[in-house]
Amino acid sequence: RFPKFKREMSRRRVTTDSVLLGLERLLLGLASIVIVANWALRRALEMVQASMASEPVFFQHWVSGCFEWLQIFFSFGGYSAVAIGLAKIAGITIEENFNAPWRASDLVDFWRRWHITLSSWVRDYLHGPVSAHFRWPATGALVAMIAMGLWHDFSWYYLGWGLWQGLGIVL
């Protein structure tokens, strides 16, 4: 990873185009965070929850979970866009962090498309070596997903979340 970054830094050039493209990406990222994630989706969820008061609790939680996923995507995607935009303004091109995760055909494909920078690092430095050491890819997948869970928060909840994701990939 460092050689690629070093090469990108040596090619770094600030141009009018890079500044304009960077500003566009930065503004789209801020709009994604402020308008979509923090305002529109929250208001929409409040309205949906109010209208679902008589629906089964499971359905209410399922709909709330879908809104939470959208809110995380637009918030995190927005922050990633802000970082990409700031880098572009400085003449640096950095990796995209999302590639249409909603188009994923399965859980493995989802993790190739969601939080690409973390997923690829975990794949290269945990999943690959652990799978090679134990000669069983399932072990690598479980260790990788548990590590990703614990990366988000060192707690029982995220340990379980990582295990759940790992089992979903293995099975």
Which residues fall in each region the model found?
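Membrane-embedded transmembrane alpha-helical bundles that form the catalytic cores
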Residues: R1-L171
